[in-house]
Amino acid sequence: QKIISMYAKGMTTRQISETIEDIYGFETSEGFISDVTDKILPQIEDWQNRPLDEVYPILYIDAIHYSVRDNGVIRKLAAYVILGINTEGKKEVLSITVGDNESSKYWLSVLNELKNRGVKDILIICADGLSGIKEAIAAAFPKTEYQRCIVHQVRNTLKYVPDKDRKAFASDLKTIYHASDEEKARLALDRVTEKWTAKYPNSMKRWYDNWDAITPIFKFSPDVRKVIYTTNAIESLNSTYRKLNRQRSVFPSDTALLKALYLATFEATKKWTMSIRNWGRVYGELSIMYEGRLPE
């Protein structure tokens, strides 16, 4: 249990071996520690194949990148995390997959796997511009609304803006996604672009390119919007996953990465017992908006 707990915190087999020697005074090989952590692989498989609910009001899909050694070559792999908000307003990690081939075909297989595990309907999927995701959603869940992640949208815009302008620029961007309706949001978008485009020529291009996938949010009340664009749930999970990157720069294999991700997930989600704030109101609005698709 102690070994698995240390592995979940992102420690390498060598660090665990050294810690055990320091604390308990006996030597353990890295191979032994690897064998102990391998014992959770069947548990991981069961978790990854467990049945899911039929309906999820909201799903978030996000990617975190890691370096993995593969036959002596270091490759960059993405861990794709799917986080659901269930009908009780509680957060739940549905799936973690490791891959390097983002495409509509890949995403279709991921979404079909959710269907095979019992998911019949999803109201809204929030994701960043993952390659092929929009087409895959349309094929697997034709009634599902695709919403670009506002936090990523803002972050991508501010990436190349120096500190001296970042606060003012971020404040102006807020006028877009806090607008009361789509028309006012579009006017705000044009205003912000006009103000900053001379200084940062391409900063707002993605807003225009992605506008169709940004606009679904404007039909909702502030309560629902907050759930959609406040990505606290996925951000807190990501900070747990990023710790793994800080602990070790390269994972020795795909399996080692998967073990670390699952154990970190089990650790992080133990505390997830509460429903989202104002969930009753949010659920009521979604029930009206998506009539007949949510359980009464």
Outline where the language-model segments fall:
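Short, amphipathic alpha-helical "recognition" segments used to contact nucleic acids or chromatin
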Residues: 1-10
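Short, hydrophobic/aromatic alpha-helical segments in well-folded domains
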Residues: 2, 19, 110-113
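Amphipathic alpha-helical transducer elements in NTP-driven molecular machines
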Residues: 13, 34, 58, 76-79, ...
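DNA-recognition alpha helix
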Residues: 14-25, 263
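RNase H-like nuclease fold core
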Residues: 26-30, 35, 39-127, 131, ...
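Conserved beta-strand -> loop -> alpha-helix junction used to position metal-binding or nucleic-acid-contacting
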Residues: 124-131, 136-172
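Acidic/histidine-rich catalytic cores and adjacent linkers
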Residues: 142, 175-296
